[in-house]
Amino acid sequence: MKRWFRSGRPWVWLTASSISISLLAMLAIIVLLAGQGMRYLWPQPVWLLTLQPEQGVQRALMGEIYAEQTLSPQQLEQADLTPASGDAETRYLIKIGQREIHGQSFRSLLSRDIVRFDKPADILVLKRTNNGTAYGYLAGMLEGEQPLVATDLPATLQHRVEQVQGLLAKAQAIRMGEMAKINQQFEVLRLEEKKRQQTRTLDNQALARLQAERIELQRRFDELSRQLTALNLDINRDTVQLRDANGSVHLIPLRDIEQAWYPNAMDLWSKVRHWGNQAKYMLARYSPDSNSAGHLFPAIFGTVLMVVLMSIVVMPLGVIAAVYLHEYAGKNSLTRWVRIAVVNLAGVPSIVYGVFGLGFFVYLIGGTLDQLFYSEALPNPTFGTPGLLWASLTLALLTLPVVIVATEEGLSRIPMSVRHGSLALGATKAETLWHVVLPMAVPAMMTGLILAVARAAGETAPLMLVGVVKSVPVLPVDDIFPYLHLERKFMHLGFQIYDLAFQSPDVEAARPLVYITALLLVLIVVGLNLAAIGIRHVLREKYRSLSL
């Protein structure tokens, strides 16, 4: 045994076990997130539950069986429920949807309350923009005030839903495209007039020009408004008649319906296609109320854009600081204290950086920029409010110590003989640094970037103070000059997870979306890291011969 310990094999087994446990834990997280998030995309069967009669009236309920729990007689007594017998009972959590009718999206039932379970093939599921999912039977459709006559009503419903969604997308393109440009031009004219008033340069000629431009813009805006009104007439025309489990018919405007399907009539291939359509719809769709509607594209876009901007800022600053500390700064007590401070900054809680970013970047720098360059827009702030730029700078400051430490470690691993050889061949110190040392240290810089991206992408607390919001009317990037709007607020996957889990009006219904959002955040971080690792590997192979 002593010989076995002295051989070092126990430590090999210990390290191998640690790596295996880490990989298994990571795999378990991925499986958990993917499995729980699958409920949001995969069509679940809808049950028709016949309930015990109440005062001689037969009752029924329609919905998805969301969860089951077996309760012992002791648990029933603790819940103030009288056990029907000495046996355990099953409690079902039923997703009933139609929150505007029931007042809630879920209902809890015991097995004693249910007489029969049925799964009719003609149960229709409507995914709506408001008040949750709707379940029922398709009783008919109204075109305006008149009943719609069709030989195949379910196919007509699918066609009309797709048609209305196309009209909604066209209307949204008008509002967020041409109308947004015109509104921006109106704002430019207003600010120009206000600035001329402040500088006393508003003469009759300038006033006439501004008025003529406003008249032309108003003419174009009115024309777009007429197009939008015509689209809204077509969008609001149709209504779906949905009959619930008890026979009552409810009217649902077709514009509120995003998708419609019959889950109990689907075979495996139909369910796979539905899963793909749901995933595409969730990842590619954008609307101003994307958070509540389950559209993740704005949050994905905001997360990636913020991380890219953060990387653009933090890499030059971190590399320059590391080069100075290692190549130029003298080895004295001051530089030792600076290195200690840099290392300790990595352990500062992220919310502290958020408070600093709010006070320094937003209020001080942003407020100063508004007074110097955007005084005509005051008191409405331009950069003196949380936004994408300040969030990126705050996270760049948060991850700066990581990049400095990783780059300095890479510089320290480069042999001094390489530097001496370059100097002996006649190169200056700056040329040696630029053409020899820095290329060999690029893999270490990429390591710092990987660590910075991994930390920044998952941060939420500081972003809540410096720019992230629940939903955005427009993205930070559009086709309006200057195309990248750094002053705008943005959405982030980390904040969306928090908002869906704790601030959603229907937490239980949003739970699968929380898991799938978390899975997307993990995949984005892994994807960005893999890209950086690939670049690091290529550069390491390129400069491997220099280190020999």
Give the location of each predicted region:
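Membrane-topology segments of multi-pass transport proteins
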Residues: 1-16, 20-28, 35-291, 547-548
